[in-house]
Structure formats: structure tokens, C-alpha cells
Amino acid sequence: MGVFQILMKNKELIPLAFFISVAATGATSFALYALKKTDVVIDRKRNPEPWEMVDPTQPQKLITINQQWKPVEELQKVRRATR
């Protein structure tokens, strides 16, 4: 028996199957969305400090309102001193 035959035989399972498929699709799409973000580290051996490569001018949040980035001179001095 196929899945559709079971659903047609037991019509009370149709909403359950619908919500399970919507939840699975949402979970999969969120996982793919999260893996595309720059703060996710999959391979730590080739890139041990990925936060150094983040472009500060590119917004990392879903929505940014009036975000203006300016480098902090003290932090730049510390970064240069630790290299």
C-alpha cells in the first residue's frame, strides 16, 4: 500500500501528514539557511579563526536599520599588536 492509499483509507491522518511535512520542510530550510551564515564553522582546521574574515561593512542580521560601521582605533591597535 502506498502512502496516498493509506491517507485515503484513513482520512484523519491527512492533517497530521500535512503538519509533519510542513514542519520537516521548515526545519530543513532553516538548517540550510543557518549553514549559509558566516558565523557557522564547519571546518575548524583550515580556518581556525573565521571571525577575523567577516566583512564589517556587510550586515550579519536579518534586518538592520541605520547601521553604520566605523572602525574603533583602539581595537585596531590591539589587533595589530597581537599579530
Curated annotation (Swiss-Prot):
Alphabetic keyword roster: Nucleus
GO cellular component: mitochondrion; nucleus
Keyword Nucleus assigned: yes
One Pfam family recorded for the sequence: B12D
Any one biological process term the GO annotation gives: response to bacterium
Disulfide bonds: none
Tissue expression as described in the entry: Strongly expressed in vertebrae, brain, intestine and stomach.
PANTHER family associated with the record: NADH-UBIQUINONE OXIDOREDUCTASE MLRQ SUBUNIT (PTHR14256), NORMAL MUCOSA OF ESOPHAGUS-SPECIFIC GENE 1 PROTEIN (PTHR14256:SF3)
Family classification: Belongs to the complex I NDUFA4 subunit family.
Protein's recorded name: Normal mucosa of esophagus-specific gene 1 protein
